[in-house]
């Protein structure tokens, strides 16, 4: 797989679980003999929702909720077949969304 690059994007609402998953991916791929760039922190998406507290009136009384999506980017340069196989067998938490591009 010479000259290829694997790009892994991780997304999660929990930054601690995201960082441990990224560290686990980097350690696994490094042990398999591939070169790793990252994890690179990408900008955090912040989604804010405004809700009226009362069901009928009192429009001045509102409540704001926010949901933050944390993202990381990992590049694997010149992946070895052993590194790809170890990536496929890796067990990661369910709250981390993983996108892999070749």
Swiss-Prot record:
Keyword hit for Ribonucleoprotein: yes
Key word Membrane present: no
Database matches in Gene3D superfamilies: Ribosomal protein S10 domain
Molecular function (Gene Ontology), one example: structural constituent of ribosome
A GO biological process held by the record: translation
GO CC aspect terms: ribonucleoprotein complex; ribosome
Keywords, comma-separated and alphabetical: Ribonucleoprotein, Ribosomal protein
Segments crossing the lipid bilayer: none
Biological role stated in the UniProt entry: Involved in the binding of tRNA to the ribosomes.
Family: Belongs to the universal ribosomal protein uS10 family.
Oligomer status and interactors: Part of the 30S ribosomal subunit.
Protein name: Small ribosomal subunit protein uS10
């Amino acid at each position: 797989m010479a000259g290829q690059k694997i790009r892994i994007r991780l997304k999660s609402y929990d930054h601690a679980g995201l960082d441990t998953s990224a560290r686990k991916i980097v350690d696994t791929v490094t042990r398999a003999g591939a070169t790793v760039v990252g994890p690179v922190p990408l900008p955090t998406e912040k989604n804010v929702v405004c809700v009226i507290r009362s069901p009928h009136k009192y429009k001045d009384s509102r409540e704001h909720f926010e949901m933050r999506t944390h993202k990381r980017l990992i590049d694997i340069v010149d992946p070895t077949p052993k590194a790809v196989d170890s990536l496929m067998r890796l067990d990661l938490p369910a709250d981390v969304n993983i996108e892999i591009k070749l």
